[in-house]
Amino acid sequence: MSKSYLKNFDVIVIGGGHAGTEAAAASARVGCKTLLLTQKITDIGVLSCNPAIGGIGKSHLVKEIDALGGLMARAIDYSGIQFRVLNSKKGPAVRSTRAQADRILYCQNIKKLLKKELNLLILETEVKDLIVKNYQVIGVLTQSNMSFYSRSVVLSTGTFLGGKIHIGLESYSAGRKGEKASIDLALRLRDLPFRVDRLKTGTPPRIDINTINFENLFVQHGDVPTPVFSFMGDISNHPLQIPCFLTHTNEKTHEIIRKNLHKSPLYTGIIKGVGPRYCPSIEDKIVRFPDRKSHQIFLEPEGLTSIEIYPNGISTSLPLDVQKEIVSSVKGLEKSKIITPGYAVEYDFFDPKDLNLTLESKWIKGLFLAGQINGTTGYEEAASQGLLAGLNAALSAKDCKQWFPRRDQAYLGVLIDDLTTQGANEPYRMFTSRSEYRLTLREDNADLRLTEIAYKLGLVDNPRWIRYNEKVLNISNEKNRLKKIKIYPKSSDSTILNQLFNIVLTKEINILNLLKRPEITYENLKYLKNFKVGISDLEAAGQIENEIKYEGYIKRQLEEINRHLKNENTPLLPTYDYNKIKGLSHEAVLKLNDYKPVSVGQASRISGITPATISILLIHLKKEYYKNHLS
């Protein structure tokens, strides 16, 4: 696409955060002329809060974004300054990669990836209004009264819609420190048929690294070998790896906080929005867990060249003088200096129950919402929604069928189903525990689950498609090879198994079945004399091992998925008036009319909808079928 001035686009994306960048890139990748509008081009892809990508459940989303051709995994591979696998001693379903990020490098790498998208134009301007005609979005209006027109719009405004920052009892309008909130657009959106509420998030003070005493603090190094996020990535992509440090709050810290709760906007009623349950402020921790003697604080570098340390664990909106007292009471931070105060930010979000599973608004055709505007918290949750919204905005612009993953296909499927079915009364964060199919939704198989779909949708380029097919072939060939290699009871390899792993063979066994034993890994097969490693790709080797070890469990889970798919594939029309279906309880009628589920499966996951309600719906659908087809 020519980068010259244009007014007409296929897709317009509002907001250059994690949701917006993925949305813009996805739309451009599938061939749509795309415009990304952002208040500050320099802040595209910025890590507003913690300088890290991944974590429990979140890393699965990053892997899925990558399998769908997205940006986040590739950007963090080139920006991560410490990589670790969390839950490494647990089963593969809950193992989660986490990377400490260099803030500057991460932004730079996101911008580099966006520059490669030939169908994408980026413009620095603020949007003040949507142009809507007959409940169809047709464009946007900027603060300078410039109009841009499109067939689809993605709204990914983060914390900027009506954003308000709180430090102590003082507050001011802002979407992020040093950046103005989007007030005109927030007011305009409240005039549209959306259900709007407020949420809150927060961030800790930043500390000058040169004023910290690291002696006697616990040092936390990254993993060796260093993990990689992208299926196209390599360890050689990583910059210099550096450690983090661990310290703790103490009784003195807690007493300072208790004495100053009357200065907290959280406890004086100034902040109305609900904060994230799984990332509470230090004030919340002290109030909610009064018996705890200490709380962890991870001292995380913000980059290789940055002098700022992010003290993960003490998010706060107390006044600056109190923040200084809190920090100075902590071991290693006695003489430290705060560079930037912590703060809380309140912002508008829209009820995600008003969205289809494609993230298109039920009320405004062509309008897609992604990220914190949908009630989520976290970069990874935002980015995955952005990719899906951008893809479907592009498909809508092309008059093509839209796509979304099911719960059994991806954590992204779990995320959007939870949001559109349950809504968000508090900021939604992804965990592996949210999925009932987590054994088949592992980090390591995200590409096997999604890349073929992505290729058919136009999201994946040829190099990735070739790499994917090579991996699939290598896994298949190696499994067949392992099946043919046998170990006999009186062989030298049988003796080795007995000596190293206390395994006594009474009959012959092939290597594939040997891998089912918990003590045997693909890596330690190298101790066998008659075995040679047949695959150099460690990721593919791990895939083989996981599939073999958990074969029985995976088989049962797949059978369960097939049983549930019958209900998932039984549609419910959005035009149904549930008042007219006999036998439904008053509560069921209210909830079904409110949520408008798209399938019987989705209806079954609405809080308060009982198995009896589902039976009544199925009977009604059966009667309706016979009425329409046999009359």
UniProtKB/Swiss-Prot annotation:
Q: Which residues bind FAD?
A: G15, G16, G17, H18, A19, G20, V127, S182, Q372
Keywords attached to this entry: Cytoplasm, FAD, Flavoprotein, NAD, tRNA processing
| GO biological process terms on file | tRNA methylation; tRNA wobble uridine modification
Question: Known SUPFAM superfamilies for this protein?
Answer: FAD/NAD(P)-binding domain
Keyword NAD appears in the UniProt entry = yes
Cellular component terms (Gene Ontology):
cytosol
Highest rank taxon of the organism: Bacteria
Q: Where in the cell is it found?
A: Cytoplasm
Named cofactor requirement(s): FAD
Amino-acid positions noted as binding NAD(+) in the UniProt annotation, renumbered to this chain: 275-289
Task: Give one GO molecular function term.
Answer: flavin adenine dinucleotide binding
- Similarity remark: Belongs to the MnmG family.
Summarize the subunit comment: Homodimer. Heterotetramer of two MnmE and two MnmG subunits.
Q: What does this protein do?
A: NAD-binding protein involved in the addition of a carboxymethylaminomethyl (cmnm) group at the wobble position (U34) of certain tRNAs, forming tRNA-cmnm(5)s(2)U34.
Q: Which PANTHER family match?
A: GLUCOSE INHIBITED DIVISION PROTEIN A (PTHR11806), PROTEIN MTO1 HOMOLOG, MITOCHONDRIAL (PTHR11806:SF0)
Which named protein is this?
tRNA uridine 5-carboxymethylaminomethyl modification enzyme MnmG
Q: Which organism is it from?
A: Buchnera aphidicola subsp. Schizaphis graminum (strain Sg)
- Record gene name: mnmG
